[in-house]
A protein has these predicted regions:
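Long amphipathic alpha-helical segments
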Residues: 100, 170, 228, 263-264, ...
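Short, amphipathic C-terminal "tail helix"
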Residues: 3-4, 8, 313-338
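Mobile late-domain/C-terminal helix-loop "cap" segments
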Residues: 264-308
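Mg2+-dependent prenyl diphosphate-binding active-site environment of isoprenoid biosynthetic enzymes
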Residues: 24-26, 33-261
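N-terminal amphipathic/basic leader segments beginning at the initiator methionine
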Residues: 1-33
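Surface-exposed helix-capping loop/turn segments at secondary-structure junctions
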Residues: 140, 308-317
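Generic structural signal for well-ordered, non-transmembrane alpha-helical segments
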Residues: 185, 213-220, 298, 302, ...
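Hydrophobic alpha-helix feature that most strongly marks membrane-spanning transmembrane helices
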Residues: 220, 230, 255-258, 270, ...
């Protein structure tokens, strides 16, 4: 297979990947832009619009940081980081269609600007390109389990998403945790697991998985609080409530209710009417549910910090910026809680 099929020049990744010069982000975005649909492609404009706001790119940063810490092949790392980041963005585009969200990263979501058909096609294109990038990472590094590993994580993510739609009744806390872990953790795990495979560090995978499951649920709790308060960037406060989507605050609120009022709430959740949505939103914000979820969020944060402290030093270096980001999100939630 010709070298031109891969990255044309092996670039050295700078040692301070989270420094203010943004070197990792620059290298990654330069590469990512090179593999997006070209100007003549019917999806080019939609792809450019979606990536005009880069987002946090946490999964790509995890992969590139792990690659540097573990001494993995740089070319393989860029291919793998791109695969995971493309899959994450495909899920965002498809989620926005499912959820009816018109805003993504302070811009119009792809479906809102270009229609559902283009958004579906762009998400599908990203999934296809992600597996091509994973195959290239596998070829460069002779790590031929990579594509299977990526496929397994994608299946886990989809299963978590499907659980959200599969519940005839609003989920209890156990079902909610299963949904949350399934939707959030797999692609974080994939980001570093693939690099561990490339670098021959597969002994890290079990503990990495434990960390990211805990971290992912903590982050989801924080996001759920922000959704109810209207500080998550969605077009309207409590969009999860209006869509009857799983949300930790709603789960805890439902548990607080006595049977007669819970039956009324369940009846409303089972319907599709937006009547009384504002009433139930007010009831939720006036209850102790937000504060209970915030307390659980901090317990999860502490647990994640405990797990991260048991990892080898080079792995702690990879996770530290993610842990800092998680703490920042929790602090933002604390500041916005009534």
């Amino acid at each position: 297979m010709p070298d031109s099929y891969f990255i044309s020049e092996k670039q050295h990744l700078p040692s301070d990947k989270y420094s203010s010069d943004g070197s990792h982000s620059f290298i990654f975005n330069k590469f990512l832009n090179s593999i997006l649909p070209p100007n003549t492609h019917p999806l080019s404009e939609a792809a450019t619009h979606h990536f005009s706001s880069e987002g946090k790119q946490l999964r790509a940063k995890i992969a590139l940081s792990a690659g540097e810490k573990f001494g993995a092949d740089t070319t393989a790392c860029l291919h793998w980081a791109s695969a995971v980041e493309l899959l994450h963005n495909a899920s965002l585009i498809h989620d926005d269609i499912c959820d009816g969200d018109t805003i993504r990263r302070n811009n119009a979501s792809v479906w809102a600007k270009y229609g559902r058909d283009i958004a579906l096609a762009l998400g599908d294109w990203m999934i296809a390109e992600a597996f091509e990038q994973a195959a290239k990472a596998a070829y460069v590094s002779n790590s031929f389990n990579l594509v299977t590993k990526l496929s397994n994580h994608v299946k886990s993510t989809i299963a978590g998403q499907a659980l959200e739609f599969d519940n005839a009744l609003y989920p209890d806390i156990d079902k909610y945790l299963e949904i949350s872990a399934g939707k959030t953790a797999p692609l974080f795990v994939a980001a570093i697991e693939g690099i561990a495979e490339i670098a021959g560090r597969s002994e890290l995978i079990e503990e990495i998985n434990h960390y990211f499951v805990t971290m992912g649920v903590c982050y989801q709790f924080a996001n759920d609080i922000q959704n109810i308060l209207g500080t998550d960037g969605a077009a309207s406060p409590s969009s999860d409530l209006k869509r009857r989507a799983p949300n930790a605050v709603i789960v805890y609120f439902r548990n607080f209710l006595k049977t007669p009022e819970r039956n009324l709430f369940d009846s409303w959740l089972a319907g599709k009417s937006q009547n009384k949505a504002n009433f139930w939103q007010r009831k939720i914000t006036e209850s102790g549910a937000i504060h209970e979820v915030a307390k659980e969020m901090h317990k999860l944060l502490k647990r994640a910090e405990g797990v991260s402290g048991t990892l080898p030093n080079d792995c702690i270096g990879v996770i530290a910026p993610i842990q800092k980001q998680l703490r920042n999100v929790c602090e933002q939630v604390d500041a916005s809680c009534p």
